[in-house]
């Protein structure tokens, strides 16, 4: 059984700075909270090559000495400016843009020009800009990727590269890669097959790794596996940038991924690999195939499971109970894809850890897909879905037909179908359950099973609400009902920080249980009383640090860690030391 949560994490009030610049400005980073160390980058680049490298470029911030040493005197304006002055200029320009996608494009151009300034911008304004750089705006950016594309980022491995993937992997110019996020573009958010346009998802996820987990942006790599697309619109669009043929399937697909995994792990043997937005059953098949071979995990199945489990456990606390009360819950899950199955399996693991048998845990779930209940007579289910089949109830029945029989206490929405949590369902659940968990998790916002306003109105304010996309708090009958974003950004950055800092050799399932329990423990009684179960997203670095510490300790306990804190440091000090800060490095030119 996992350690009681009180022993493995501290409440949010004890991990967030209470005074100083961070408390006043509510940004992600404060010098007093980290071990500041001047970054040094050794390069053989000079002149325009420096200015054209977003990892080295400082724009107008190069000093006179740097201009001489780097051969850029006369190539930039003469008076050097600080990073702070550059940030203020860019923020002023960004604020003039009203359209969310245009804001995304502006930030994309900034990232491709000056990464340090880009991350300074995001970190200073995370709550404002997180919906721009990731959900919901990133969904539109993926759909229009081939229309707004201006500059490449990351790597593409296509069907044209079969038999040559090791050579392709060698083309990446940096030897040190800590985190890779890879997608095949087959199931982008709730938008379906977007092919090569899915590249915006790994780019966005890695921005969150940097901002939330403090991973060095020089050491991240977004990748698309372009195995074709079944999207007819893209197949017929002359501007589409990916391979215009139907997707590889079956053995051909798995042979392609096998070659890529071999090539990429040979090139970057220490990298954590996050699989992202692969359709079922490929997502689960790849997870089961590689989980014990390399340091990898599936974000949709496992990270989503971790943060949803954290939401459920925090709901137990908000009701005045303990984590063990999860054994009494009844779950109605709409959606049986990779995310739906992954979420429910993670919750099952927790129920078992609290003392139930696995069969007893599965019996707490009623899962539905587009054909209705996973029940008796359904012979179309994948093995991963069959364990959730209700053998005593005829398959295909709708949630409305079974609602009064099930009497759920927690609603899980992973269907990508809006408005499925309707008035009848929400009002009925709230009529017999104190603070039912209402979790419409589908992204983007347009696919959410209900809005926060609908959930509050139809439950008369009796609920704990957590959604995949952000919703504002709701004013209801003279009080403010807090909303929560049940977003993977609370989980995977801290997981990555712990795995990278310990150089773990694999990612056991226990990782996500530890993560969930840490996050669920962070809400204070005062927060929980208002319906708020998570710290604000602008405190993500503090949350990620707590998660990372426990993940690193778990790796050490399980003998999968290969790197440890230096003598005189504990894990907390070591992880703080490792967290990257947006400050300009000292650039040393050397013939390598």
From Swiss-Prot:
<dbReference type="GO" id="GO:0006108">
    <property type="term" value="P:malate metabolic process"/>
</dbReference>
<keyword id="KW-0479">Metal-binding</keyword>
<comment type="similarity">
    <text>Belongs to the malic enzymes family.</text>
</comment>
<keyword id="KW-0377">Hydrogenosome</keyword>
<dbReference type="GO" id="GO:0042566">
    <property type="term" value="C:hydrogenosome"/>
</dbReference>
<dbReference type="Pfam" id="PF03949">
    <property type="entry name" value="Malic_M"/>
</dbReference>
<feature type="binding site">
    <location>
        <begin position="335"/>
        <end position="352"/>
    </location>
    <ligand>
        <name>NADP(+)</name>
    </ligand>
</feature>
<feature type="binding site">
    <location>
        <begin position="182"/>
        <end position="205"/>
    </location>
    <ligand>
        <name>NADP(+)</name>
    </ligand>
</feature>
<feature type="active site" description="Proton donor">
    <location>
        <position position="134"/>
    </location>
</feature>
<dbReference type="InterPro" id="IPR001891">
    <property type="entry name" value="Malic_OxRdtase"/>
</dbReference>
<keyword id="KW-0560">Oxidoreductase</keyword>
<dbReference type="InterPro" id="IPR012301">
    <property type="entry name" value="Malic_N_dom"/>
</dbReference>
<feature type="binding site">
    <location>
        <position position="277"/>
    </location>
    <ligand>
        <name>a divalent metal cation</name>
    </ligand>
</feature>
<dbReference type="GO" id="GO:0004471">
    <property type="term" value="F:malate dehydrogenase (decarboxylating) (NAD+) activity"/>
</dbReference>
<dbReference type="InterPro" id="IPR046346">
    <property type="entry name" value="Aminoacid_DH-like_N_sf"/>
</dbReference>
<feature type="binding site">
    <location>
        <position position="300"/>
    </location>
    <ligand>
        <name>a divalent metal cation</name>
    </ligand>
</feature>
<dbReference type="InterPro" id="IPR037062">
    <property type="entry name" value="Malic_N_dom_sf"/>
</dbReference>
<dbReference type="InterPro" id="IPR036291">
    <property type="entry name" value="NAD(P)-bd_dom_sf"/>
</dbReference>
<dbReference type="GO" id="GO:0004473">
    <property type="term" value="F:malate dehydrogenase (decarboxylating) (NADP+) activity"/>
</dbReference>
<dbReference type="GO" id="GO:0005739">
    <property type="term" value="C:mitochondrion"/>
</dbReference>
<dbReference type="InterPro" id="IPR015884">
    <property type="entry name" value="Malic_enzyme_CS"/>
</dbReference>
<feature type="binding site">
    <location>
        <position position="276"/>
    </location>
    <ligand>
        <name>a divalent metal cation</name>
    </ligand>
</feature>
<feature type="binding site">
    <location>
        <position position="300"/>
    </location>
    <ligand>
        <name>NAD(+)</name>
    </ligand>
</feature>
<feature type="transit peptide" description="Hydrogenosome">
    <location>
        <begin position="1"/>
        <end position="27"/>
    </location>
</feature>
<dbReference type="InterPro" id="IPR012302">
    <property type="entry name" value="Malic_NAD-bd"/>
</dbReference>
<dbReference type="GO" id="GO:0046872">
    <property type="term" value="F:metal ion binding"/>
</dbReference>
<dbReference type="GO" id="GO:0051287">
    <property type="term" value="F:NAD binding"/>
</dbReference>
<feature type="binding site">
    <location>
        <position position="187"/>
    </location>
    <ligand>
        <name>NAD(+)</name>
    </ligand>
</feature>
<keyword id="KW-0809">Transit peptide</keyword>
<feature type="binding site">
    <location>
        <position position="443"/>
    </location>
    <ligand>
        <name>NAD(+)</name>
    </ligand>
</feature>
<dbReference type="GO" id="GO:0008948">
    <property type="term" value="F:oxaloacetate decarboxylase activity"/>
</dbReference>
<keyword id="KW-0521">NADP</keyword>
<dbReference type="Pfam" id="PF00390">
    <property type="entry name" value="malic"/>
</dbReference>
<feature type="active site" description="Proton acceptor">
    <location>
        <position position="205"/>
    </location>
</feature>
<protein>
    <recommendedName>
        <fullName>Malic enzyme, hydrogenosomal</fullName>
        <ecNumber>1.1.1.40</ecNumber>
    </recommendedName>
</protein>
<feature type="site" description="Important for activity">
    <location>
        <position position="300"/>
    </location>
</feature>
